[in-house]
Amino acid sequence: MLLSEEPATLIHHTIENFNIAPDKTAVARVTESLATLQQARDLRVREAESSLKKLSRQLATHTSRHDDLVTSHSSADHASNIARLDTLKFRTAKAAADAETDAERLALTAADLKARLRELELQGVEGDAAANARRRDPVDDEVLLRLKVYRSLGIDIERDERDGEWSKAVIRNDRKGDVHVVNMDKKFSRFFYANYFWQTL
């Protein structure tokens, strides 16, 4: 009976008996899933390529900046800048030392002028030494004598304008080339300052 049927009919009945519809549906689902996965993969590849291009551009930019910095800051320029700064530092230090020396010299000049002014005030405007000696107070003579002795030793002392006490002494040592300015405090005795002055001289 099978041999009497048409081949096409036989094939059709065979296919129906196999019931391949669920398999076709499964294959369709698998094909759809593969297509979805391929789309997701293509999207991730495009995103990775975009990130790679962005990083490549950033790398090129940073490389260019690095090359420019290396070119503009060569070792020779760095050494030249260091030498220039050292020279400027030396000149600044020398100028500061010169200014300090000038300030000390001017302070000595001012102290000397004050001492001379004090001496002239004690002598009087007329300049008559004998008459002035008769008119002057013995205390003024003692002060004048002390000032002369101190000045002969290289010491200029100044009074405080408020209470008239000796407040500052400028000691010059021409042999050593030293200058010391001493602010005299009442809590130290005259013996202490006398010893200090002699040690400084």
UniProtKB/Swiss-Prot annotation:
Q: Which PANTHER family match?
A: KINETOCHORE PROTEIN SPC24, PTHR22142
Q: Which GO terms describe its cellular component?
A: cytoplasm; Ndc80 complex; nucleus; spindle pole body
Task: Please list every transmembrane segment annotated in the UniProt record, as residue ranges.
Answer: none
Keyword hit for Phosphoprotein: no
The protein's location, in the record's own words, is: Nucleus; Chromosome, Centromere, Kinetochore; Cytoplasm, Cytoskeleton, Microtubule organizing center, Spindle pole body
Q: What is this protein called?
A: Probable kinetochore protein SPC24
Species, as recorded: Gibberella zeae (strain ATCC MYA-4620 / CBS 123657 / FGSC 9075 / NRRL 31084 / PH-1)
State the gene name recorded for this protein: SPC24
Q: What is its main location?
A: nucleus
Which Gene Ontology terms cover its molecular function? microtubule binding
